[in-house]
Regions:
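Residues that define the transmembrane beta-barrel architecture of outer-membrane proteins
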Residues: 73-77, 157, 161-166, 209-213
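Transmembrane beta-strands of outer-membrane beta-barrel pores
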Residues: 85-87, 96-100, 167, 183-190, ...
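Repeated loop/turn-to-beta-strand initiation elements of outer-membrane beta-barrel proteins
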Residues: 87-90, 176-177
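Membrane-embedded beta-strand positions of outer-membrane beta-barrel proteins
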Residues: 92, 179-181, 217
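Conserved small-residue
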Residues: 1-69
């Protein structure tokens, strides 16, 4: 699915370079007119040229571009066999998606707006005065929503491709009954580690996909 210039659901984003290491670096770089007061630990965006190739040294809505994979998968696939050997049967089904991005948004721990839960990756890796990591997984913490850091940008864009073992079933067949064990959502392989990639974009704090196990007996009655 496409439109002129880019794919449908490809995101128009600011290009994040990294985080500012301190306040003095903020002053040495193009002014970021995206709202709020920009400080050390905030996201540093790339200044893009205009149609004439000129730089205005101001970061605003003109410094966005369509980039990355769309948030709707370009490829959705699945596969799985059903096998039988003597009295045993076995089946499984893998489901996957490729060429898709996840946009992380709505995450604002300790703030007065948005979702205030603290995800583990934030607790483990955020910028602070004692951890001035310009590639930290989360910018500096703030009491109020920091507009500079919540703009849709490549800082929050992730590879959302995944391959999931959706169903697996093992059965034993007797003359009058069949006993089976079935599992759903058993394994997920993905470069995205923050939440179930099948949930898609957002904060990851909606109800997760459940892992389910069933044991059952099927009877057959011959007249």
């Amino acid at each position: 699915i496409s439109r002129v210039g880019h794919s449908v659901d490809q995101q128009l984003l600011y290009i994040a370079e990294r985080l500012f290491i301190d306040d003095s670096e903020v002053q040495r770089n193009p002014k970021q007119n995206l709202g709020g007061w920009v400080s050390g630990g905030d996201i540093k965006y790339k200044n893009l040229p205009d149609v004439n190739g000129n730089y205005d040294n101001v970061i605003d809505s003109n410094d966005r571009q369509y980039t990355g994979m769309p948030t709707t998968p370009e490829i959705v696939y699945g596969f799985g066999p059903s096998l039988r050997y003597k009295k045993f049967d076995f089946s499984f089904f893998f489901q996957g998606a490729a060429r898709v991005s996840i946009m992380m948004n709505g995450i604002h721990p300790f703030g007065a707006d948005g979702t205030r839960n603290v995800l583990q990756f934030i607790a483990d890796d955020y910028w602070s005065d004692t951890n001035q990591d310009i590639y930290a997984g989360y910018p500096r913490l703030s009491k109020r929503d920091n507009e500079n850091n919540t703009k849709a940008s490549t800082y929050w864009q992730r590879n959302g491709a995944f391959l999931k073992l959706k169903n697996l079933e093992v059965g034993f067949n007797h003359k009058f009954f069949r006993v089976y064990l079935r599992g759903s959502n058993l394994l997920t392989f993905s470069p995205f580690k923050y939440w179930d990639p099948e949930m898609g974009s957002g904060s990851g704090l909606s109800y997760p996909t459940q892992r389910v196990f069933n044991v059952g007996v099927q009877f057959s009655i011959n007249k």
